[in-house]
Each structure stands twice: as C-alpha cells, then as structure tokens.
Amino acid sequence: MKQSKISRRSFLLGLGAVSAAAVLTACGGSSSASTATAASGSSVVYRTLDQIKESGTINIGVFSDKNPFGYVDENGEYQGYDVYFARRLGEDLGVEINFVSTEAANRIEYLQTGKVDLILANFTVTDERAEEVDFALPYMNVALGVVSPDSNVIKSLDNWNSKDQMIVISGTTAETYLTENYPDIPLQKYDSYATAKNALENGNGVAWANDNTEVIAFALQNKGYTVGISELGNKDTIAPAVSKGNDTLLDWVNEEIKSLGDEQFFHKDYEETLVDTYGKDYEEDLVVEGGAVQ
C-alpha cells in the first residue's frame, strides 16, 4: 500500500405530469405522481412513500463505475458502500430495488424527472444543490483531494502553470470549487469516474481533483500515484437525496438513518465494503452514524 504517501484525512428540464407518469410506469412505479417546483423553476416529479410501497419497487440511483462506493462487479451485480446501504433501505421498506446507473452530472436531473426515487451516489451536500433536491441526514464525511503521478506530486494549487490542466468530473463539487476559487486553472471535464481515471492514466492532465475518498482510493489501488492534497476546501458530508418536496420519503429515510445508527450500521458497511481499500485508519474520519456529524 502507498498510505505512507497520503496524508490522513473526494438540460435540468422539468417534465409535465403526463410525461412523469410514463417514466414512472416504465420504471415499475405508480402511474400517479406528485409534483413540486425547485428553486430553478423546474417542475419536479416524484412518488410518495405510499406510492413506492404500493408499486413494490424503489428506484435508486447509484454509480456503476466508482469502486468501492458504487460499481458493477464481474458477475454484473451492484456492489459498494452506497449499494450496501441501498439494499438495507429496500429490505426495511419491504420493496424490491431497481438500481439505476447514474453519473455525477445527472443526479439532480434523475430526481427531478422521476427517473429515480432516491440518489445514493456519493452526493455531497451543498447549499446550491439543496435548492434543487432535498437531502436526508448524512452518512459520510468528505473533503476534496488532488491526486497526481509520483513524478509530479501536486501539494499546492498556488502558482499553477496556466498550461497545465486539472481533470475534474462534470457536476461535482470539485468542478464548482475550482471554478470559483481557482478560475485560472484550466479544467479538463469528463462525464464519469471511468473516463476521468483514464484521462489521468493517459497523461491528459497533470492531476485529478475529486472527493478525497475517491482520489485516496484511486492512489491506493493504482501504483505510481500520490494524493498530495488530501483536504482541499471545506469538509462536507455525503447524504441521500430525494426530489424537492418529497417529504414522506425524506422523513422515512431520516428516521431509518437514525435507527441504523443505534446498531452502528455504517461501521459495518465500512467493514464490508471499504476496509479493504482504506484499512482501519480512515474509518472514524469517514463514517457518520445516526446522521450526527461529530
């Protein structure tokens, strides 16, 4: 492992009710849907908790290429920290889960258009996002980090060479943070974790900025890379998200997170899905139990 090199501590269009009903029916949901309006003015479509129960299926958006948080294994099964949590939610709700592969840039869109009922995809809570979706209680801590090849370890973003490009994923907090705080750093934007990872490996950018959990995992899993900046900007939290105004589902998820805290569920989740990547050293830094940030 390379832990010694890593500091301890990565068309929002609204649809009408008729279109929403078609989407929800196709996903196995109720033909009846509720609507609300987000801060952007977009019409938001969602299924209430009772409608989800009645349908027998909940549609949950997760990543399919972001090991160890959400990915598809060699058997075609979804796995990871977020997926482990999702399966427990489905079990306790008494419904089947329809996993919907999502990218960072379409998490809000998928909620607003009713394609998913819930997002569990390393979704960092921000004020801007909270105007468009409703976040439940958090279940993980996170900050931003920067990973680069061992031959050019990036330890500071000050005095950045304007010819060098930073790799980011569109729709992430890393993109927003760098745009607002380091506008002179050229950003090379990709739509997915996999394409950003490939870009770094192919030398298309000098470094990759993302959630520190993700860049640390990348460096631990890939020889020749170092996380030179393990905490960039503010410390934030990861939380589930539902469509704006879907209070019945939001309240249920919040109560579930509180209840799961009593059994230290997210520590068990960490042990099952993250310990092989991070070891024990990061567990208390990352895990949030019962929605209570220490």
Features from the language model and the residues they span:
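Ligand-binding clefts/hinges and TM-proximal coupling segments of bilobed small-molecule sensing domains
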Residues: G29, T173-Y190, V227-I229, I257-Q294
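Flexible hinge/capping segments at coil-to-helix
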Residues: T37, S148-Q165
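Periplasmic-binding protein-like
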Residues: N141-S148, I216-I257, D276-Q294
